[in-house]
Amino acid sequence: PGTQLTMRTFHVGGAASRAAAADGVDSRNAGTIREHNVKTVVNREKQRVAVTRTGEIGVIDAQGRERERYKIPYGAIVLVKEGDAVKAGQRLGKWDAHTHPIITEIAGQIRFQDFEDGVTIARETDDVTGVQTMVITDPKTRGSAGKDLKPVIALFDAHGKPVNFAGTEIPAAYALPPKAIVSLEDEGEVQVGDVIARIPQESAKSRDITGGLPRVADL
């Protein structure tokens, strides 16, 4: 039994690390879902969006043993919930393999702060779709005037007052790291679970993206 346990633990760990580079995770066995530290918000499509970085989903067999467990990255769409019966091969969660999203947990009107064309942001147009996005520039490449600017997306209510994160006195504002991609319009409306910005995987790997996000204590 000792050898078996070691092998299984290793296998689960391997599966979790492989899943991180994929665009989702599937159950290997039939069983019942058990969630570990999974915190979600429900988006406008009625999907559960993970807003923790430490959440995991396990699959329990009929004897109550956890047969497998997977890390669920921040921003993933969680397709199952605690107590659900799942089949072998069923998809448990999915995410964008190429970018890390910044998710809003608060609804409101967004306002861009320190967004300056050609200084803190560069505008790019997709050749195929024609959709224009803004990319946050690296402070190292900015002139002296832009070095101290910190692009932020802040949230306000219908009366133009800043909204706070739920249960806190902290204004809801999301600091954007270099290379973050923004597809929203200034003064547009966002709902809970919407993507505020996306950070390309390669730039996210090179720095701790939680440093640019609020609510770190909750994650």
Segments from the language model and where they lie:
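Intrinsically disordered, low-complexity regulatory segments
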Residues: P1-L219
